[in-house]
Amino acid sequence: MKIFLFGVMTFLIVINTLGCSKNEAYNSQEAIKRGDIVYQNEVVNLERLKQFLINLSNKKEDTIRITGYTIEGDPIFHDLQFDGKVIQYTYDNSNDHFAGDDKGTEKDVCKEVVKKENEHGEAEFLLSGCSKGNSLFLLRVEKEKLKKQWSN
């Protein structure tokens, strides 16, 4: 009887863990509802990025998720968790059905988010000062859209 109960409990724990996975795939409408900064054809919830940047400059803890989608609709997650000192970054393309050998998660620790203008006049947001030595691209926004949304 004990073995049976142990088996049932183990099964329930595994099912619960899999069902509540933080990185479970969800569509862009659900991502918007959850408060993710979503980029697909356009960037949605951009004001959340602005608040995160304000919190960074004030050394206030904050967490955001930036979710992009492949052409096929598979989510790519960028999780940024600021502890008041550094940004813990996780890149997760484990739901990308066409990721090939690069499929999975990668982690890094970075110092800041920088905004740069690219050759097309768009604002690009990147993580810099990362422990692995390279800057990490987060998202790209048309400068006019950024100015319009952030002027409010």
Question: Would you name each region that the model predicts?
Answer:
Residues 71-152:
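Extracytoplasmic electrostatic interaction patches
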Residues 21-79, 84-88:
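N-terminal export/targeting and maturation segments
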Residues 8-12:
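Sec-dependent N-terminal signal peptides
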Residues 16-19:
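C-terminal motif of bacterial Sec signal peptides marking the signal peptidase cleavage site
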Residues 1-5:
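Positively charged n-region of N-terminal signal peptides that target proteins for export
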